[in-house]
Amino acid sequence: MVVIRLARGGSKKRPFFNIVATDSRNRRDGRFIERVGFYNPLAGEGEEGLRIVQDRLTYWEGVGAQLSPTVARLVKQGAKKAAA
């Protein structure tokens, strides 16, 4: 099953997450099919904290990919931010 979830990057104490489409059997930071966006929880005022390529996310959902709970929350947050 394909899932869209976070893959951790960054250094120690400085997390950075890629939003990726991957097979659910792969490791968290392992092989992935496609990078759909990123999330930077420590983004400053002038930095972009969240970017999701919406058309690719829609494609993956259309072919049956499941969103992880955290990614679903981030998508909702990103949609609210885009509407504002």
From Swiss-Prot:
Q: Which UniProt keywords apply?
A: Ribonucleoprotein, Ribosomal protein
Q: GO CC annotations?
A: cytoplasm; small ribosomal subunit
Record keyword Ribosomal protein present: yes
Record GO terms (molecular function): structural constituent of ribosome
Q: A GO biological process this protein is involved in?
A: translation
**Any Pfam family hit:** Ribosomal_S16
InterPro entries, per database record: Ribosomal_bS16 (IPR000307), Ribosomal_bS16_dom_sf (IPR023803)
Family, as annotated = Belongs to the bacterial ribosomal protein bS16 family.
Q: Which NCBIfam families match?
A: S16
* Record PANTHER family: 30S RIBOSOMAL PROTEIN S16, SMALL RIBOSOMAL SUBUNIT PROTEIN BS16M
Record protein name field:
Small ribosomal subunit protein bS16
Origin species, per record, is Ralstonia pickettii (strain 12J)
Q: Which gene encodes it?
A: rpsP
